[in-house]
Swiss-Prot record:
Chloride binds at residues 202, 304, 343. The active site is at 204 (nucleophile), 241 (proton donor). It comes from Drosophila melanogaster. Changing residue 403 to A: In strain: J87, JP-60 and KO123. The lineage of its organism: Eukaryota, Metazoa, Ecdysozoa, Arthropoda, Hexapoda. Ca(2+) binds at residues 116, 165, 174, 208. Pfam families: Alpha-amylase, Alpha-amylase_C. InterPro entries: A-amylase/branching_C (IPR006048), A-amylase_C (IPR031319), Alpha_amylase (IPR006046), Glyco_hydro_13_cat_dom (IPR006047), Glyco_hydro_b (IPR013780), Glycoside_hydrolase_SF (IPR017853). Binds 1 Ca(2+) ion per subunit. Changing residue 474 to Y: In strain: KN-23. This is Alpha-amylase A. Monomer.
Length: 494
């Protein structure tokens, strides 16, 4: 037993040194989740917007064949029928082309992969034409049989780790990742995506799988494909969906030796702060002091595709596109702060939490419509195209690894800080104006506020801020303004 445990620990250590590198192209940071977009549309977005605006990566919806469900809800993508690359987003040829085109403009691809389970009862027909019999645990498209699954049981007690990992999540047939054949099939699937040029994976429902089994799977994966610009010996970036708000049997610390985790406490906490339930002044120690995993183990976000719908963690405290002023402020803070690896959500609008993406006919996904101001229509929200968000991606790229300096707060809901001498940001979440002379840390000069506008040649389409020889500037953010944040950086100097 001791030897077995030692082998598992060594496997964890071997994986640990490789899976935390995002594999971003130099000078870029931040990824965006283009939720339910088609592959052809993502390829064009990489070339036309993500690449030119400094985004480092794109998380895409599950790429493999899923069950076709009545009314085509978004969650059908999380009910696998096979590992064939055939979904409403496109086929394998389109996906491969997308990855190649995105890599060519410096935007890496991260695939949402689902291998905790297969489709639940009722999922008998797939998007690639495969059939299945979930009631008998038969999925010929892989193929999987009943021998490859855990015994049928429901998860009802999250204080029982065995039940959480060995029973079925909402009726989804629970694969046994300790089974060598299942491991072979999962590794084959992930390696195929690596061959096509992806940079990493978001592992769905990782909390419901045993860490030792995941260590074996991750440890068997190929190195990234150098034909797509990755350095020799690079490993896939692994981010695991582990919802840990405390008080349950399973902890995120069981997974942080394997890769990064989705830090849901970040989403919950940032929502509370910018909704006014906590004061901005307390953000001075934002990070592990708030119960988050280590920075290089934390994928951070304001909201994700689950909790913006009330699923997962956070509940009513989660900020979404439906509360735009505070959402933009929270997103700007996330991108201005050095903690974690930030992911921007890009949604489609919804009124029903089961509602799928916009379609042309009830089945085929519609392409987003782009407006002259960069925003989207046609049912797509495209938060990643909001100026207050994409300009903060450029801010993050500009400040690099510079530390937070010159922290200021008013003892309430007005704060500011610099990132070294390269960027400065201020926030006002009070119900009265912010009008203060603040230390920006920046060289003297006139700067364009990249929240209210953008630098255009030698002019600015928004507010300007004049920094004196002492680094101080008069900062003004009215409580009734559309944006409760102001940001300047050295690349926005006029």
């Amino acid at each position: 037993m001791f030897l077995a445990k030692s082998i598992v620990c060594l496997a964890l250590l071997a994986v640990a040194n490789a899976q935390f590198d995002t594999n971003y192209a130099s000078g870029r940071s931040g990824m965006v989740h283009l939720f339910e977009w088609k592959w052809d549309d993502i390829a064009a977005e990489c070339e036309n917007f993500l690449g030119p605006n400094g985004y480092a990566g794109v998380q895409v919806s599950p790429v493999n064949e899923n069950a076709v469900k009545d009314s085509r809800p978004w969650w059908e993508r999380y009910q696998p029928i096979s590992y064939k690359l055939e979904t409403r987003s496109g086929n394998e040829e389109q996906f491969a082309s997308m990855v190649k085109r995105c890599n060519a403009v410096g935007v890496r691809t991260y695939v949402d992969v689902v291998f905790n389970h297969m489709a639940a009862d009722g999922g008998t027909y797939g998007t690639g034409g495969s059939t299945a019999s979930p009631s008998s645990k038969s999925y010929p498209g892989v193929p999987y049989s009943s021998l490859d699954f855990n015994p049928t049981c429901a998860i009802s007690n999250y204080n029982d780790a065995n039940e959480v990992r060995n029973c079925e999540l909402v009726g989804l047939r629970d694969l046994n990742q300790g089974n060598s054949y299942v491991q072979d099939k999962v590794v084959e699937f992930l390696d195929h995506l690596i061959d096509l040029g992806v940079a990493g994976f978001r592992v769905d429902a990782a909390k419901h799988m045993w860490p030792a089994d995941l260590a074996v799977i991750y440890g068997r994966l190929k190195n990234l494909n150098t034909d797509h610009g990755f350095a020799s010996g690079s490993k896939a970036y692994i981010v695991q969906e582990v919802i840990d708000m405390g008080g349950e049997a399973i902890s995120k610390s069981e997974y942080t030796g394997l890769g990064a985790i989705t830090e849901f406490r970040h989403s919950d906490s940032i929502g509370k702060v910018f909704r006014g339930k906590d004061q901005l002044q307390y953000l001075t120690n934002w990070g592990t002091a708030w119960g988050f995993a280590a920075s290089d183990r934390s994928l951070v976000f304001v909201d994700n595709h689950d909790n913006q719908r009330g699923h997962g963690a956070g509940g009513a405290d989660v900020l979404t596109y439906k509360v735009p002023k505070q959402y933009k402020m929270a997103s700007a803070f996330m991108l201005a702060h050095p903690f974690g690896t930030p992911r921007v959500m890009s949604s489609f609008s919804f009124t029903d939490t089961d509602q799928g993406p916009p379609t042309t006919d009830g089945h085929n996904i519609a392409s987003p419509i782009f407006n002259s101001d960069n925003s989207c229509s046609g049912g797509w929200v495209c938060e990643h195209r909001w100026r207050q968000i994409y300009n903060m991606v450029a801010f993050r790229n500009t400040v690099g690894s510079d530390e937070i300096q010159n922290w200021w707060d008013n003892g309430s809901n007005q704060i500011s800080f610099s990132r070294g001498s390269r960027g400065f940001v201020a926030f006002n979440n009070d119900n009265y104006d912010l009008n203060s002379s603040l230390q920006t840390g920046l060289p003297a000069g006139t700067y364009c506020d990249v929240i209210s506008g953008s630098k255009s040649g030698s002019s600015c389409t928004g507010k300007t801020v004049t920094v004196g020889s002492d680094g101080r500037a008069s900062i003004n953010i009215g409580s009734s303004e559309d944006d409760g944040v102001l940001a300047i950086h050295v690349n926005a100097k006029l």
